[in-house]
């Protein structure tokens, strides 16, 4: 179904965005401790 494909795409995008946000947060924290 088309909506299922859209849902999967949205989920993948959200996952990538979450990973990027986590990476940025980890970067900021590690730089703050140095």
UniProtKB/Swiss-Prot annotation:
Location of the protein in the cell: Secreted
Protein's name in the database: Dermaseptin-S2
Family of this protein: Belongs to the frog skin active peptide (FSAP) family. Dermaseptin subfamily.
GO cellular component: extracellular region
One Pfam family hit: DD_K
Keywords: Amphibian defense peptide, Antibiotic, Antimicrobial, Fungicide, Secreted
Protein task: Potent antimicrobial peptide with activity against bacteria and protozoa. Also has activity against fungi. Probably acts by disturbing membrane functions with its amphipathic structure.
UniProt GO BP: defense response to bacterium; defense response to fungus; killing of cells of another organism
Tissue distribution: Expressed by the skin glands.
Family annotation (InterPro entries): Dermaseptin_dom
């Amino acid at each position: 179904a088309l909506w299922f494909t859209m849902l999967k795409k949205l989920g993948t995008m959200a996952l990538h965005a979450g990973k990027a946000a986590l990476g940025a947060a980890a970067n900021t924290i590690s730089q703050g401790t140095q």
